[in-house]
């Protein structure tokens, strides 16, 4: 296995394009799960170290949220429609208390409004069109008016709204009926705008496979109907079909270019309609694998691959929402173990996975006003307005031995006598709770003591040094992700204090 040695010279006169929207939105399991304590503990951890602005999930109108109620009077036989906001208020309160605004997904169908019995997932979300579109529109409008009354109109109208989820899959939308989805979109769009025209509404929220066909047809439809759609949404997953084994699905990663190609196609399709040229694209779901039981999600390989994604997803996309923040998630039922290949950044037991830190590192790049001074296949480096340098370095590989270790020699402009270098390292040797869990015997239900050890193993390795010449050397083993901060530093030793003498042990 060969090592790769690369030299990078930072030139402050160069401003490099880099749109870092890492914290705009994150995904969640269905909204009803937000009533669980462990769900909120995981969300607290994510918000403390990353701090997303929006959250998006399925199940807004599903029966466990109990918003839509249809009652029949036993004496008169008269039907009455009622709206119950008890649970949705609890969920929204929890989000807003944690600094999160919802990215509302309109779906799935309340059972008593549905035109059919088709459901999806362990929790049986109904995925058929409404039996009565007027009732569907009233449901949307009543909910929005309630939210505006409770949280304030000026706030709520800023919440993006997406119509449905992955209608190009027959499991998510009955027969993947494109014409019927377009009807749903149009009716929903104007129902929302009738409440307040400032709401921003988009779709079609499609996933890969038939995405090009659907997005092209969607843009033709809104153009023909003269619908002033506010943004386009799609999903982005980057593995091949999984190989099912027991409770798990093992999937191969796509190459970088294959993973990004369909996103470029989406941009081209939208811009081919002059009236919509430049329209925002929101990637409302992305991850490596699209299944919630892919062991890849728990690995350092996932963290490094996502680092490369985050370095480029802002090129042409307004936002990109990782699916999901945590592993309280029940699409295929309740998982058997803490490391079951769940989508989340956090494993059950509040154990940060390596990818958690990829997001935290990219968020650190934008904590201060800055410009990007370097971006390539292994790094993103920014300079803050107060003169610091911050960077995320990564060496992602698809297969063992693809690149070996990458040694980066970074040359920064030396304008002071010394710099203080701080690094945070995540790799398979230093921050790998999955390996510790394996070495414990892969307990399905770890004890409290085991969970504490797993949590301890899940933190980056901290490094520090004083740099006098502006040169920094960082070694990146396969699938490593390293965060660095470099800032000017002047030693202010107390009278008589000599650190070198202390370290001589004399």
Where do the language-model regions lie?
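Substrate-binding cleft and catalytic face of glycoside hydrolase catalytic domains
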Residues: 50-254, 291
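Carbohydrate-binding surface patches
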Residues: 376-438, 478-493
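Conserved, mostly hydrophobic/aromatic
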Residues: 25, 95, 143, 161, ...
